[in-house]
């Protein structure tokens, strides 16, 4: 059995730990079969091939949640670069959880998500759902609550340009720099931005969505980890981008607009001015985890 889980853009501007967007490219793939124990092999980007692997952690968690014994063999084709800001651990966790669910005949979304969150906990230290939820459901997702699971899904149809520089930002490190408290005016601003962004998405107003891609809760405190972002954003805007933002905790950046290839080229040149190599691609919105 084979499971595909797409990369994701977490936060999507003002929706810290709440908003997420699945993208079609890249993705992780898991080939799974029943086994007497829990084992994993990995192809592609280098990640652990033992109990530290988040796909295996998620698969084990699902077995435990439903009270099943036994095991599973996973072959993970790692297509999403770790520490990229594109939900690498979230996609692997969803792939592992879905694989275990299909083998055991589990169809309960909440159990699958809860198992995948254990993979995210392993990777980043906290079970945040803004990567695993869109990777599972696809489209644009809003995580209202994880316990109980309350998720809202908005079907959207547009393309984004994503650029990934040759630097890493571990999610665990990016979360450490965040303050315990933020100014009330910043919280109010993000609520206004997030509410307006959801409305713009529902109306299909991509230019307005781009304008609302701001963040006053996390990005100001993370700029020390992504010091090149203001210049990359400026280059994208000059090339015609509606909006530009860090994907997740970075370093990946995404932009909305019409001339996406030109925007990607402009961002690449901006990265190169810092001596940083980067690759960009244009992708559609992803439709969630799939299996066959």
UniProtKB/Swiss-Prot annotation:
One of its GO terms (cellular component) is cytoplasm. Catalyzes the ATP-dependent phosphorylation of L-homoserine to L-homoserine phosphate. It is found in: Cytoplasm. Its EC number is 2.7.1.39. Keywords: Amino-acid biosynthesis, ATP-binding, Cytoplasm, Kinase, Nucleotide-binding, Threonine biosynthesis, Transferase. ATP binds at residues 81-91. Pathway: Amino-acid biosynthesis; L-threonine biosynthesis; L-threonine from L-aspartate: step 4/5. GO terms for biological process: threonine biosynthetic process. It catalyses: L-homoserine + ATP = O-phospho-L-homoserine + ADP + H(+). This is Homoserine kinase. The keyword Kinase applies. SUPFAM superfamilies: GHMP Kinase, C-terminal domain, Ribosomal protein S5 domain 2-like. Belongs to the GHMP kinase family. Homoserine kinase subfamily. The keyword ATP-binding applies. GO terms for molecular function: ATP binding; homoserine kinase activity. The gene is thrB.
């Amino acid at each position: 059995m084979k499971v595909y889980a797409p990369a994701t853009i977490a936060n999507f501007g003002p929706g810290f730990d709440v908003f997420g967007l699945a993208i079609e490219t890249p993705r992780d793939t898991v080939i799974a079969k029943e086994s007497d124990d829990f084992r994993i092999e990995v192809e592609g980007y280098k990640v652990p091939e033992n109990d530290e692997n988040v796909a295996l952690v998620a698969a084990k968690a699902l077995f435990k949640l439903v009270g099943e014994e036994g095991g599973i063999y996973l072959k993970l084709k790692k297509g999403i670069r770790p520490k990229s800001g594109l939900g690498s651990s979230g996609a692997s966790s969803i792939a592992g959880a879905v694989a275990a669910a299909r083998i055991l005949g589990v169809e309960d979304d909440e159990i699958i998500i809860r198992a995948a969150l254990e993979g995210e906990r392993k990777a980043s230290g906290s079970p945040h759902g803004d990567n695993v939820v869109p990777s599972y459901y696809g489209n644009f997702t809003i995580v209202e609550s994880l316990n109980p699971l309350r998720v809202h899904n908005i079907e959207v149809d547009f393309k984004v340009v994503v650029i990934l520089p040759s630097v890493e930002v571990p999610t665990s490190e990016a979360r450490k720099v965040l303050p315990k408290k933020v100014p009330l005016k910043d919280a109010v601003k993000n609520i206004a931005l997030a509410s307006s962004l959801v409305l713009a998405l529902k109306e299909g107003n991509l230019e307005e969505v781009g304008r609302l891609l701001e963040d006053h809760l996390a990005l100001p405190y993370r700029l020390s980890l992504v010091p090149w972002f203001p210049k990359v954003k400026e280059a994208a805007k000059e090339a015609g981008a509606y909006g530009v933002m860090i994907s997740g905790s970075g370093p990946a950046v995404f932009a909305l607009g019409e001339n996406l290839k030109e925007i990607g080229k402009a961002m690449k040149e901006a990265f190169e001015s810092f001596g940083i190599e980067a690759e960009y691609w244009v992708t559609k919105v992803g439709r969630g985890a799939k299996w066959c």
